[in-house]
Amino acid sequence: MLNLKSFLAVDFGAGSLKLAEFEVNEAGGLRLKQFVIKSLGSEGSQEAKREATVLKALQDVLVEKDIKAKGINVCAPGFHVFSKFVKLPPVDSGKVTQIIQYEAQQNVPFPLEEVVWDYQIL
């Protein structure tokens, strides 16, 4: 992501949309260019209206603040994601992916083809 001149970090929270625009300097460091918090109001917590409310809020902020960044990092609210810690048996690294996929199939309450999932070995 840092090969871009600027990028956005977006947090779709339960009650507000938070957006930060960063510029990348020559040394690879980040500079906060602007930060916006926009309330989603009561419609932001109503499941039937949430998607349209968040989309409108995001479009409004992008236009109002004249944001041109092409890259984006998204943070989803906790009630839209879940995590699971799994203790793996000692196996060679080639089998880790198979074990993780099996564990995901057992623990994710949706078909894996319909979700975005990933893992990190700690």
Give the ranges of each region predicted by the language model.
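Hydrophobic/aromatic-enriched cytosolic interaction surfaces used to assemble or bind macromolecules
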Residues: 1-122
